[in-house]
A protein has these predicted regions:
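Glycine/serine-rich anion-binding loops at beta->alpha junctions
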Residues: 91-107
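Fold-level recognition of mixed alpha/beta catalytic cores in primary-metabolism enzymes, strongest
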Residues: 103, 107-110, 117-171
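Residues within alpha-helical segments
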Residues: 10, 54, 87, 105, ...
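Acidic/His- and Gly-rich active-site-bordering loop/insert found
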Residues: 1-96, 117-122
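Short charge-dense sequence patches
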Residues: 3, 59-64, 97, 150-164
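Conserved acidic functional residues
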Residues: 16, 100, 133
Length: 171
């Protein structure tokens, strides 16, 4: 199955996942990942949904970490568009979480989908650790999931965080 990064990003933006409310973002992501062969585990801590999805069982395990939650949009009347109804204008995706970081997640999922189609005999694992608790006080997200994974003897060898936090151009 081929996943469209733009369509997945739009679908994620349509989920008003304001911390800590998930609004279905984690389930949408899990559904897409399952369609390309990932085993998905939704891990709930208090009122926060988290996702650990893994493709493959061997090592090394390369993990992508990110979050689906967004900060509150404030007064919707101050927006020129509904922040949870994505639009593409001048080749730019506009909507709550487009930059931080729903489009990044969609691009990674699409890249993995393409990689899987071209590398059927890949020896190793690819995983995603996605939380719904990054924009808030972050007590029930990544830190707790990592502890949970350690208890389950799950090892992550390499990890990239797709968070767009550096304002400087690199490369």
């Amino acid at each position: 199955m081929q996943i469209s990064e733009l369509e997945l990003a739009k679908d994620l933006i349509r989920k008003p996942s304001v911390t800590p409310k998930d609004a279905g973002a984690i389930n949408l992501l899990a559904k897409n990942l399952r369609s390309i062969g990932f085993n998905c585990k939704i891990i709930n801590f208090k009122n926060v949904k988290n996702l650990y999805a893994k493709l493959g069982k061997s090592y090394p395990n390369f993990c992508y970490a990110g979050h689906t939650d967004v900060v509150p949009p404030g007064n919707i009347k101050n927006w020129t568009i509904n922040p949870f109804k994505p639009v593409v204008r001048n080749n730019k995706l506009i909507g709550r979480g487009a930059n931080d970081m729903k489009a990044s997640i969609a691009c990674f999922v699409t890249a993995v989908s393409r990689f899987r189609n071209q590398n059927k005999n890949f020896k190793g694992s690819i995983s995603l650790l996605i939380t719904g608790d990054e924009e808030g006080i972050a007590l029930n997200g990544t830190k707790r999931v990592v502890k949970y994974l350690k208890r389950k003897k799950e090892k992550i060898n390499f990890c990239i965080v797709g968070e767009p936090t550096n304002p400087n151009k690199l490369g």
